[in-house]
Amino acid sequence: MGEHMGAVSHTHQPGWFDLVSVMMEGMLANAGREEAESFLYSMGESLAARYPLPDARTVQDLERDMNLQLARFSWGFVQLQPQDAAILLKHHALPAGDGVLDMESWQSALAAVLAGLYGGWLRAQGGGAAVVVALDFNDGNTLHFRY
């Protein structure tokens, strides 16, 4: 997905981005991190249902279709790496927070949404319902998920 490598920052509509940031900050403050991330995961699953992907014949097709949807949201891009018993998903170019919510909390909240989104898309492609997309680690620039 070399054409996406230069996509490091995105513009966001004023007001809308602020609302999302305030909502995430409020969820984390009022519900706690674990409950907020569970809720955000389910919101990602809802987005996957609202923006379904066409049936993919190859991993490359799936990656392309995921990236087309992510581009609609200006949420960066993903690279899929099939393994023997897993698929690694590397999400790059996350939208930067507004600076009000600390970067770690912002990225954790977005990671929860993305995990739900990717999980919903993968289940719709025939993936097992019992297998979840989980964040392996965040290196500060890239979110590394495992399915």
For the regions a language model picked out, list residue spans one by one.
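C-terminal non-catalytic interaction appendages of large macromolecular assemblies
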Residues: 107-147
